[in-house]
Amino acid sequence: MSNNGLDIQDKPPAPPMRNTSTMIGAGSKDAGTLNHGSKPLPPNPEEKKKKDRFYRAILPGDKTNKKKEKERPEISLPSDFEHTIHVGFDAVTGEFTGMPEQWARLLQTSNITKSEQKKNPQAVLDVLEFYNSKKTSNSQKYMSFTDKSAEDYNSSNTLNVKAVSETPAVPPVSEDEDDDDDGTPPPVIAPRPEHTKSVYTRSVIEPLPITPTRDVATSPISPTENNTTPPDALTRNTEKQKKKPKMSDEEILEKLRSIVSVGDPKKKYTRFEKIGQGASGTVYTAMDVATGQEVAIKQMNLQQQPKKELIINEILVMRENKNPNIVNYLDSYLVGDELWVVMEYLAGGSLTDVVTETCMDEGQIAAVCRECLQALEFLHSNQVIHRDIKSDNILLGMDGSVKLTDFGFCAQITPEQSKRSTMVGTPYWMAPEVVTRKAYGPKVDIWSLGIMAIEMIEGEPPYLNENPLRALYLIATNGTPELQNPEKLSAIFRDFLNRCLEMDVEKRGSAKELLQHQFLKIAKPLSSLTPLIAAAKEATKNNH
């Protein structure tokens, strides 16, 4: 007798799918207006110079320009000078005065209303300052957090902001800095890559900020004749700090040779299969001949890496931070002009595919949150802040395993610097203290986890369809975002979200504390994610 009837009856129901995919650019008719990432990035004027310098580094016989370089007089960079910009706000007219033209253009197209500007002009300036620091360039982000044995290659920006009525200043702000970009208005920040199959194949990335050092303070401006109340005033004082010397290409290559493994990876790995091509290189899957383990190998042409010195940090630190909930670094090799980085491979793709294509229940969301909190508790206990928690950076195994990846914005906290202030990450997931340029600690990751939980509920983070600059303003001023249908959530889930999305950093839960939250006790087995992963993979395949 045939068992076909039984087979059909026993087959589990298909996972609930979203009526329309929330994936930006995945066949949406509105993709053209929402997918800012599809816009071409501006050309990098320094790319040719950097390539030429790198060619000279790896080809010692090339001395074409050395004589000319020697003939040039050495002129040191200016130091200890100040550039003061006065930006005022007239409460009567509702207009900013003395605002740089670049900022004025950004504000004009930001969709931040006049009433919103009048309500909180300081927040407007905060987000303009932040947005300007997030210039998009053709740069790759690396796992650039530092450990005690790795040199800090990041230049430092200092930012102090105080309101007219206040005397204390906000703690200093430190930003990563590149040395060759005066900057034009940046293109709109992409909400997320057009289609995230896996972060291994992701080519749309948020770069590290490239801005001059700023020291910003506020002071009153002269009131208008007919206005008895002085308007809010903001004086921006910019002081150029000395930059740390950058490593030469020769030094970078020498250091890399001392770090990477010796030998031919083509003998250690077999069955190479190309799975992705990005701006920084090509990604393959391969098989470890000795163990049979499937791995991901990213092959990067060093000539095309704009911040080669950060690769050293990446490798040094990745091998120091291994955890079951982190996509682990396995090995690295120099092969000709290429750096090969071998990583753990997860075939299930990113959590983004699941949240945009399927509907997760609370038990499944709790399981993902638990795994992410375990990764964060490990990182935070090792003084590492991830700074870019979002669904794109969570990889899934076909067995339902959940692992955190993409440490390009990580920061190491030293005892001397218990809080960081670098403006990095992806705006829609950012904590308010980051957007408003305050010093921050590991709990910025907890806020981002809360936003990611909203992603799992609604398919996208709050404000994703807003102009990015207005989204930053809303994050800075609205506080905890509102859910579309909070009544559909259990009380313990709402409490978990409130603990993650607490504006007061002191009251916000830590990773260690939240691992004890009652919400995680309803977590389903990780295997419950497998049908969602399979359904999402099928849906994304059909969207291509």
UniProtKB/Swiss-Prot annotation:
PANTHER family: NON-SPECIFIC SERINE_THREONINE PROTEIN KINASE, SERINE/THREONINE-PROTEIN KINASE SAMKA-RELATED-RELATED. It comes from Bos taurus (Bovine). InterPro entries: CRIB_dom (IPR000095), CRIB_dom_sf (IPR036936), Kinase-like_dom_sf (IPR011009), PAK3-like (IPR051931), PAK_BD (IPR033923), Prot_kinase_dom (IPR000719), Protein_kinase_ATP_BS (IPR017441), Ser/Thr_kinase_AS (IPR008271). Disulfide bonds: none annotated. Belongs to the protein kinase superfamily. STE Ser/Thr protein kinase family. STE20 subfamily. Autophosphorylated in trans, meaning that in a dimer, one kinase molecule phosphorylates the other one. Activated by autophosphorylation at Thr-422 in response to a conformation change, triggered by interaction with GTP-bound CDC42 or RAC1. Activated by phosphorylation at Thr-422 by BRSK2 and by PDPK1. Phosphorylated by JAK2 in response to PRL; this increases PAK1 kinase activity. Phosphorylated at Ser-21 by PKB/AKT; this reduces interaction with NCK1 and association with focal adhesion sites. Upon DNA damage, phosphorylated at Thr-211 and translocates to the nucleoplasm. Keywords: Acetylation, Allosteric enzyme, Apoptosis, ATP-binding, Cell junction, Cell membrane, Cell projection, Chromosome, Cytoplasm, Cytoskeleton, Exocytosis, Kinase, Membrane, Nucleotide-binding, Nucleus, Phosphoprotein, Serine/threonine-protein kinase, Transferase. The keyword Acetylation applies. Phosphorylation of Thr-84 by OXSR1 inhibits activation. Activated by binding small G proteins. Binding of GTP-bound CDC42 or RAC1 to the autoregulatory region releases monomers from the autoinhibited dimer, and enables activation by phosphorylation of Thr-422. The modification N-acetylserine is found at residue 2. The modification Phosphothreonine is found at residues 84, 184, 211, 218, 224, 228-229, 422. Residues 174-183 have a biased composition (Acidic residues). The active site is at residue 388. This is Serine/threonine-protein kinase PAK 1.
